[in-house]
Amino acid sequence: MDIKMLDYVVMIAKCESISKAAEKLYLTQSGLNQQLLKLERNLGIKLFERDHHHFRITDAGKIYVRNAMEILRIQRNTLMQLSDLKNNICLLYTSDAADD
């Protein structure tokens, strides 16, 4: 499983619709649906209940989405911290070079 799939499932849950989520993610509805079905097969559990008129998140889906959101938050924070560190190292290096 990759980070993209976490984003996909979170968006599906927020939109309560694969078609709306696919539109926001710039994906085809069928492509997103196939990704979701593949994930559910791999997990061995349904994340969403669906029929022609309804699309509801399951209890397992709620757990998955809650944890996916936490993982995505940690990833964003980590990338920001690394970016800040990189910028500080560049500033320090530039500052030291200017002192010579």
Locations of regions flagged by a protein language model:
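Short helix-boundary/capping micro-motifs
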Residues: V10-L27
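Residue cluster at the C-terminal edge of the helix-turn-helix DNA-binding motif
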Residues: C15, K24, K38-K46
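Immediate post-signal peptide segment of exported/extracytoplasmic ligand-binding proteins
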Residues: K86-L92
